[in-house]
């Protein structure tokens, strides 16, 4: 009996010798292969293995599919630790290699498994050759491994998803009367031909023992090899099996016929025959024969791949004696071999590449893709020699070409009980979800294809398609498969054509702008034509049942989704209207208005029967109404009674929303832009039935009206949050923030003048004012501030740096008069990617009058500002960048009185001051899109008083003098606390006020410093100044070293 013969590996017996080459390790390889450029992958390494181009592997690589993340299993002899497998090979055997001896005791290494593994997945590193799935990992186990480790069961339970089997049982070879091998004219031995009926019968006799062995971890011996394969297939693995090297008149043996006993695993089984480089079946290759319905062909003749060889370290013999003496080395290299053993790993590599390409597909579906996209060879269709044909990665990466049922298999090759499934069930699970849970091949779907994928092949066959999972599948080809199409979850987008009926149920959605035979949307099923806005064509009937959904997208230019069918039956269902908002309206000066538009959303040639239940917009500011007109269903859009400011939550938001409300236009764009919606005279009295049940008359003609881009963008809001985000960005708060900051930071000028006067009076002040004996002085200014946002206004950050200069002189012995100037630069970072900068030029007068211990100080300053602002507007699909340059001026007057109270321990000065500040900006004209703002000349003022106490003291030691100073004050603001600016959108007159962060009514003034006199010429100083309140915090720090020469 065939199965009782000793298993032996189908090496390259009778197929000639192979060459051997060695390479050394290389520097890090820079792959020239590029996405979208198949020819860039054809390097010297690629071209050394002719099978890669024969299966069009370069097209898969150019799409980014290389087997990455996939693990290949190999059942063979032990795989050598070759550099081509560095970091990617796991061995599950007992650690020994396969060696053989001839009659003279010469020893050789069994590198068959090494050669096979290289064809499937050798690395692409610029050296030698590379495998089909060069980024895949490999797990290898020995076919005959009689140690304590059960490597085959470990392989079944591993992450390997495809298992290569390049082994088999050879038939007898005919011999002459002398016992010598009979050779055929082509140089091949004359193998005894297997007989189909006998092979299948032998398989059936082994069925019970094979099945019993597969139901538990598979032991070695007996029928364990076939039990291993059956168990692996039922655990979700794809089994790839070499057909055998028993001449092309022969057929595969019993192991390859396992699906005849177990048809449930046929879809997980692939037999592979050997092609020459001329696309002919090799004379050595067994034909597909009875396995034709699950057989393919692949290159297998003279294939260059990884090998190993035993070599003597001493130049002596390579035999058992030398091995025992340790004189032999096992060296990796490359060589050529031929046989179906070399063809099978091509298909294994193809499967790994496709498993990366279609991460959601099961092994049986990958098998279907491989078979149905194979290039037909020989007799048209499935045939005895080539089966489905030569594997073709270029086509395979574009999805299946047939949904197979038994009707698609020629009767002579049909395996009873196989291809029983009528539907190809594809689960596009959504990114991050689990596929094939509870199996050894369970995995998390993490690539982009898990959420969206497209198949571009033309799909035929007697089967149908069932779409499940939350993701989207797009069919781009001309699909003529005869089975039904079901959409049970997620989205099926028909952008080519599907001849069959489509049934949509549960949470499924039919979309696209192609053609279907007919569709029926059941409860919870949805139809959403187009990809964006488009038309779905239906050759026959479009049917909506109660509880179904028709999702219609409309645009402001009169375009809308549409269904074009022969007939429509409306048994209920809802029309859900959404607005196309992919267009950036803010980049336009004028937009077509959505309001008043009439759309045709369903058109037929033979009539509409019934009505939809309702129409449901998901927008608070628009409402829709349906219009039934003979063969068509129309839809109109009008404004609801809700005002924009009804969804605003703050005064700034409400102010902007009310201004946008005034932007609604009522004039047509142009006469030629009018779009008429013709209504037959008999239908003029028809009423539009809105979702609220109100009857509204249909206008005979609707014109496209010019709308303001901002107004039109507001119509698409679905929530209060969207409106609030938009109004905050449109408000132009940065201008109010800059005005507020300039008023706040005017204090640095009056503080500097006051400090200089106190310094000249002999009071201890900060040493950051550097003065000479002639009254000239200078001060470097550096500060930063923060305004805390509130419910109405976002906060902002400021920084100011610059220099102030002055000159003063004593007047009448008890007074002083001076002037100051300077330059500072203020930077402000506001909310929502807005910022501003101001170049500030200062001029001021100051003076004092002393009455003994009492000092009266006063002054005034004037500042010219050159302001640059920039702000971003981004909400939904809308985006714009607005910039402005304008001038402003700040003037202030201040007065202070202080009383000097001196003691031996500390010097105190109670003080009180009063300041008035007036800010005025010139016209504001932003440059940008529709969201650009303008503002007239406007001004605002502030009055503040401060009561406080200054103190200083000094310690003298033998080597240094230390002086401490401080100031504590209470500041009070008078009048209104709001800091606001009036703005309006360009080309409109509707003004609105935008508020910055309000000023705190009361706040604290803090100053502290220390001076350390190192010697009579050097003084080291450090100081801090701050204004702190609930809404604003301004801080400055100064440090310096003064050296007198």
From Swiss-Prot:
Pfam families: Autotransporter, PATR, Peptidase_S8. Residues 49-397 form the Peptidase S8 domain. Gene3D superfamilies: Autotransporter beta-domain, Peptidase S8/S53 domain. It comes from the Bacteria. The keyword Signal applies. Keywords: Hydrolase, Protease, Secreted, Serine protease, Signal, Zymogen. Residues 769-1045 form the Autotransporter domain. It is found in: Secreted. CDD domains: Peptidases_S8_Autotransporter_serine_protease_like. Its EC number is 3.4.21.-. InterPro entries: Autotransporte_beta, Autotransporte_beta_dom_sf, Autotrns_rpt, OM_autotransptr_brl_dom, Pectin_lyase_fold/virulence, Peptidase_S8/S53_dom, Peptidase_S8/S53_dom_sf, Peptidase_S8_His-AS. This is Extracellular serine protease. It comes from Serratia marcescens.
